[in-house]
Amino acid sequence: MPTPTKGARLGGSPAHERLMLANLATSLFQHGKIQTTETKARRLRPLAEQLITKAKRGDLASRRRVLAVVKDKDVVYTLFDQIAPRYANRNGGYTRIVKTGPRKGDAAPMAIIELVEELADAQPKANKKTAARKAAQQDKVEALAPADEAPAPTGGDQDAEAPVSVSGDTTAARADSDLAIEENNEQNKA
């Protein structure tokens, strides 16, 4: 257990510091990484690592000790069932502090504290976006390829028209407009 700091505490009183660190730990376990001041990140690191070590034990007493600090039961569940098993063969060093630039406004030194191995739910968000782009490009290629390589129709269907939807659009026009809407949405997000 780290020795308590002497002198001024974060937030004024020891009770306020304890509550602030508990809230920071809750946010860290919930989101995988948080941005805060360097001082708060340095003070949070030992607490977060102790809580992960207790969660690795997995027994009821450890769960109750963690619940005494982290009041959100959903976050405790995530800590015990998702975060702790990832660190089963790691002895400490569960967090990383990366210094960022000074904060605009008061020039306080800022840092990002994050769990060393990314959370599983943070990864698919980026993959969905790239997968959507690839799918849109693939659809665009498929839409262009049949028009170039399609053999001329033979037989009595030469006078047949393209299928028309209820709104009066052809399916090709509808596909082009859907692609344009998706591209516009992606540009607005970026």
Curated annotation (Swiss-Prot):
Gene3D superfamilies in alphabetical order: Ribosomal protein L17
GO molecular function terms attached to this record: structural constituent of ribosome
Record keyword Ribosomal protein present: yes
Bias (Acidic residues): 179-190
Residue ranges, compositional bias (Low complexity): 143-153
GO BP terms: translation
CC annotations in GO: cytosolic large ribosomal subunit
PROSITE patterns attached to this UniProt entry: RIBOSOMAL_L17
Residue span of region Disordered: 127-190
Entry keyword set: Ribonucleoprotein, Ribosomal protein
Subunit-structure text: Part of the 50S ribosomal subunit. Contacts protein L32.
Family: Belongs to the bacterial ribosomal protein bL17 family.
Protein name, entry field: Large ribosomal subunit protein bL17
Organism, scientific name: Salinispora arenicola (strain CNS-205)
Biological classification of the source: Bacteria, Bacillati, Actinomycetota, Actinomycetes, Micromonosporales
